[in-house]
A protein has these predicted regions:
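Catalytic, metal-anchored helix/loop core of enzyme active sites in primary metabolism
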Residues: 1-378
């Protein structure tokens, strides 16, 4: 069970919910990091008293240093600071809750210190899953999933001793805010429309990914890496209610699932307390009033991002890094009002067609694929 924790991305949706869990479970904080949210970071640092607070942005870090001058909190900036927070000796666990590929180097730094990784930053696994898992094995670092679907799979696999008995993993997908819409209807969807998720309140990037269904595609690749499963042994089912968080189907056709209210504090907490369970702040599920549970198939023709991600999953090598880099660039453009909703998939397809895939990539190949994909997408 975790006792002292570093959070990379503490001011975001996962970061703040992680602090709720840490406070409720009596754990302590070694380091906090964010990009530029000075005020929120100051508040968090005063409340949780970490040794180290890091802001990626230099100017924001200088401001934070002045604001925290009356405390013992050391303030750093940039990637150097992020790496120091990830490897800080007093922490046994690092929660990776930054958004995007920027999380890769700090995740590797934490792994090399043998820390438990509570992994929310799925982009890291999509880009460099094989590398990250090999390093985790070499350094004896545990990786525990924070993503609700992967936590559900993890919990549904806990009783299983022989992976050969697993027929397939089934990821549930809410369908997002645009479920049931046609391509014509999606044409004019704006930033505001995309940011209205029916079941979860999350950061802007992942909320857009949930609207395009790219999020489920990223999760598909994340599951392949975390559970060593080939793409043909993973399926996606639309489940609008987000009550069943994912399932494992075994060779005898038994299905084991994990259910819960849609509340990220539960999977965050389990990544910290595993193999124990303790009472925590997550909302209980009221089975008697949650209504019927429904299931359906995803529409891969309307939601092209999901089809592109499945293609990248089957291709392997740097295809995941290309998919992800192009998507990060395209989503940033969509959020800035520069491209339309359907153009996100166009940009990703464009990058996948243009950037060559490297088999068995090292870190340099992955970083190169990411940069080339971002350029090709713009
Ligand atoms: P948010 O956008 O809410 O938060 C992101 C955090 O990362 C903030 O602390 C932000 O700081 C920091 N950050 C952003 N960009 C950078 C950067 N370039 N360098 C350093 N720090 C940066 O995201 P979420 O919490 O929603 O998501 C975080 C990760 O967790 C993502 O990978 C997402 O896919 C995954 N995830 C999220 C879920 C959710 O429910 N939110 C569910 C499952 C997975 P600042 O505040 O200063 O911008
Ligand atoms: Mg998820």
């Amino acid at each position: 069970m975790s006792k002292r924790i570093s959070i990379l991305g503490s001011t975001g949706s996962i970061g703040r919910q992680s602090l709720d869990v840490i406070a409720a479970c009596g754990m302590s904080v070694a380091a906090l990091t964010a990009n530029s949210s000075v005020e929120r970071m100051e508040e968090q640092a005063r409340q949780f008293k970490p040794e180290l607070a890091v802001l990626m942005d230099e100017k924001a870090a200088a401001d934070l240093r002045i604001r925290l001058a009356d405390t013992n909190v050391r303030v750093l900036s940039g990637m150097e600071g992020l790496l120091e927070a990830a490897a800080i000796p007093s922490a046994d666990t690092v929660i990776t809750a930054v958004v995007g590929m920027v999380g890769l180097r700090p995740t590797l730094a934490a792994i090399r210190e043998g820390k438990r990784i509570a992994l929310a930053n799925k982009e890291t696994l999509v880009c460099a899953g094989q590398l990250v898992l090999e390093e985790a094995k070499d350094y004896g670092a545990q990786i525990l999933p924070v993503d609700s679907e992967h936590s559900a799979l993890f919990q549904s696999l806990e009783g299983n001793k022989d992976r050969g008995e697993v027929k397939r993993l089934i990821l549930t997908c809410s369908g997002g805010p645009f479920y049931g819409k046609t391509r014509e209807q999606l044409q004019g969807m704006t930033r505001e429309d995309a940011l209205r998720h029916p079941n979860w309140s999350m950061g802007a990037k992942i909320t857009v990914d949930s609207a395009t269904l790219m999020n489920k595609g990223l999760e598909f690749i994340e599951a392949m890496h975390l559970y060593h499963m080939p793409p043909e042994k993973i399926a996606i089912v639309i489940h609008r209610e987000s009550i069943i968080h994912s399932l494992v189907e075994y060779c005898d056709n038994a299905m084991i699932a994990q259910l819960g209210a849609p509340d990220m504090r539960l999977p965050i907490q389990y990544a910290l307390t595993w193999p124990k369970r303790v009472p925590g702040p997550a909302n209980p599920l009221d089975l008697w009033n949650c209504g019927p549970l429904t299931f359906g198939s995803p529409d891969l023709e309307t939601f092209r991002c999901l089809a592109l991600a499945l293609e990248a999953a089957r291709t392997g090598g740097t295809a995941g890094a290309i998919l992800n880099g192009a998507n990060e660039a395209a989503v940033a453009q969509f959020l800035a009002g520069k491209i339309g909703f359907l153009e996100i998939a166009d940009r990703v397809a464009q990058a996948m067609a243009k950037v060559p895939v490297v088999r068995e990539p090292g870190l340099a190949d992955i970083l190169e694929a990411d940069a080339a994909a971002r350029e090709a997408a713009l």
